[in-house]
UniProtKB/Swiss-Prot annotation:
Keyword Metal-binding: no
UniProt organism field: Brucella canis (strain ATCC 23365 / NCTC 10854 / RM-666)
Name of the top EC class for this enzyme: translocase
Subcellular location: Cell inner membrane
Main location: membrane
Gene from which the chain derives: nuoH
Coiled coil: none
Entry function: NDH-1 shuttles electrons from NADH, via FMN and iron-sulfur (Fe-S) centers, to quinones in the respiratory chain. The immediate electron acceptor for the enzyme in this species is believed to be ubiquinone. Couples the redox reaction to proton translocation (for every two electrons transferred, four hydrogen ions are translocated across the cytoplasmic membrane), and thus conserves the redox energy in a proton gradient. This subunit may bind ubiquinone.
Protein name in the entry: NADH-quinone oxidoreductase subunit H
GO cellular component term, pick one: plasma membrane
InterPro entries: NADH_UbQ_OxRdtase_su1/FPO, NADH_UbQ_OxRdtase_su1_CS
Documented EC number(s): 7.1.1.-
Keywords: Cell inner membrane, Cell membrane, Membrane, NAD, Quinone, Translocase, Transmembrane, Transmembrane helix, Ubiquinone
Length: 347
């Protein structure tokens, strides 16, 4: 009996505990990133932003949570009730499930699997189903049009993101996210005789891929200037028009968790994960999770600034950028990287 407990029950309990801790921390981080997003946007427009609930408005996200939870959920009379309520749940759960393999520090992951990047790509590809289900089940033309736009947009930019990831995998030689971070201890900087630093991270040697990934991540998560899924002037709120209360909150939560995931992926793939910017003794004392969170917040700051400054693209411009610009660039970089590694015997 003790053998069964040690072999099966105890590992399951540990994974469940890790999952609960990750979920709580993730929700708190998302709440304050949403607060930061609103504050940055307000600062650009010379406004104060959230400033009433708590000091400097720090508890605004939690007040919004209570507001959504206690509102009455309204379901359109012609909607497919089961699918209508299931869609936001699917979006939120799938968005949070992808975080199971993200290492925020060395050894700090719920599941440190050898195909972590493949797992993320597979799960995130399913998130579009929640949007499509919500748009179709609403039995309204505007949500349905928003869902169709979302499906086309996400599929288009997943191709570019996939090629970017292939380029990183060719360079590193592993699908394990921890291995990808540790491989960035050495790079262009150390080849030039410099100490380990941010010059060794993949953002420098794969800079075109870093730019393609960042812009594709904006489109994949429906962030401005690619928020055509919920363009206010055309589709009001897109697939979320008919949603209110907790179902709307779940859609909104799934969207921001996906944005945070893209920031975390940029950190892991290109910005050295939990590694300090320079390998010196006083920076090495700082816990790796602090460096990881600082890099994640920097990536989110870039997302927020793009939202504040860049005007929305037209739908044809969005599709042209994905298929006629990013796809050829990312495909060329895959071939160029593979050729370089083969010629110089690094493969």
């Amino acid at each position: 009996m003790e053998g069964i407990f040690a072999a099966y029950v105890l590992p399951a309990l540990i994974i469940a505990l890790k999952s609960v801790v990750l979920l709580v921390v993730l929700l708190i981080v998302v709440a304050y990133l949403l607060y930061a997003d609103r504050k940055i946007w307000a600062a650009v427009q010379l406004r104060r932003g959230p400033n009433v609930v708590g000091p400097w408005g720090l508890f605004q996200a939690f007040a919004d949570l209570l507001k959504f939870v206690f509102k009455e959920p309204i379901i359109p009379s012609g909607a497919n009730k089961g699918v209508f309520l299931l869609a936001p749940f699917i979006s939120a759960v799938l968005a949070m499930a992808t975080w199971a393999v993200i290492p925020v520090n060395e050894g700090w992951a719920v599941a440190n699997i050898n195909v972590g990047i493949l797992y993320i790509f597979a799960i995130s590809s399913l998130e579009v189903y929640g949007v499509i289900m919500g748009g179709w089940a609403s039995n309204s033309k505007y949500p349905f049009l928003g869902a169709l736009r979302s499906a086309a947009q996400m599929v288009s930019y997943e191709v570019s993101i996939g090629f970017v990831i292939v380029t990183v995998l060719l360079t590193v030689g592993s699908l394990n996210l921890t291995d990808i971070v540790l491989s960035q201890n050495t790079g262009l900087g150390t080849m030039l005789g410099l100490p380990a630093s941010f010059l060794d991270w993949n953002w420098l040697c794969l800079f075109p891929m870093f730019v393609v990934f960042f812009i594709s991540a904006l489109a994949e998560t429906n962030r401005p200037p690619f928020d055509l899924v919920e363009a206010e002037s055309e589709l009001v709120a897109g697939h979320m028009i008919e949603y209110s209360s907790t179902p709307f909150l779940l859609f909104f939560l799934g969207e921001y968790v996906a944005i945070t995931l893209m920031c975390a992926l940029m950190t892991v793939l290109f910005l050295g994960g939990w590694l300090p910017p320079v390998d010196v003794w006083f920076l090495s004392w700082v816990p790796g999770i602090i460096w990881f969170m600082l890099k994640l917040c920097f990536c989110f700051f870039l997302f927020a600034m793009v939202k504040a400054f860049v005007p929305r693209y037209r739908y044809d411009q969005l599709m042209r950028l994905g298929w006629k610009v990013f796809l050829p660039i990312s495909l060329f970089m895959v071939v160029a990287t593979a050729t370089f590694l083969k010629v110089f015997g690094l493969a």
